[in-house]
Amino acid sequence: MGRADVAAALVERIQPTALAREQRLPVLPAFESLIPGGGLRRGSTLATDGPAATSLALAAAAAASQDGAWVAAVGFPSLGLLAAAELGIALERFVLVASPDTEIGPDNEETAWAAAVAALVDAFEVVLVQATHRVKVRDGRRLAARTRERGAVLVQVGSSGWSEGADVTLEVTEARWEGLADGYGHLRSRRVTVVGGGRREASRPRRSELWLPSTDGLVESVVPDPVPLRAG
């Protein structure tokens, strides 16, 4: 049984159950002003980019997983469960999935990849995806349509591989670790600048500085409210 089949088999067990009563999944307070409506809209796509794109994506999905949503991550060979937990992911509702096998041949690899991701969208409420190839426009549109149909949230990590833009974008434009002093000590916190944008309701740019994480291991705002940017 292939990975797409395994993911499809999970549909009956983990299928979203609150589509009618809840149209947005919660996010941590640090993200509420960066994401329109203060939550992840079901049926939408989110893209994270920049030097901390994976950490940002996990943190964006953390509150949803804590609230009961199942989260899958596909295409992250170096991601460990401890790192996900430290960013707030509830591991009892988190599944790491390897990229689809490539034995089928290079001509069909991208199609198999898209089918595997589509199966995960059917089964999970939030799906984090890191593409190792350029996603075809056709596949990107089909995945977006599947996401809308299923009421899931598709998170594109490292958006440069995607031809289609996301509904909401979060880009880390600056990141620096803090904690070292005079050549000794430990890296204890990471301060990042995040710029938010996107389409329609997300088109007005936003900017905020976050601890990802703070010295206490939390994801939180450095300044409580993000700074509005003038649309150029």
Question: Predicted regions span which residues?
Answer:
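Phosphate-binding/switch region of NTP-binding enzymes
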Residues: 159-224
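A short acidic, amphipathic alpha-helical/loop segment
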Residues: 56-60, 83, 116-117, 139-143
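A contiguous pocket-lining binding segment that forms or flanks enzyme active sites
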Residues: 120-167
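Short, solvent-exposed amphipathic alpha-helical segments in soluble enzyme
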Residues: 62-63, 88-89, 144-146
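Detector for small/aliphatic-rich hydrophobic stretches
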Residues: 1-73, 199, 229-232
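Long, charge-dense
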Residues: 72-136
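Hydrophobic/aromatic beta-strand patches that form the interior of the parallel beta-sheet core
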Residues: 46, 72, 95-97, 155, ...
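Amphipathic coiled-coil/heptad-repeat helices and related helical stalk/stem segments
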Residues: 27, 31, 57, 110-113, ...
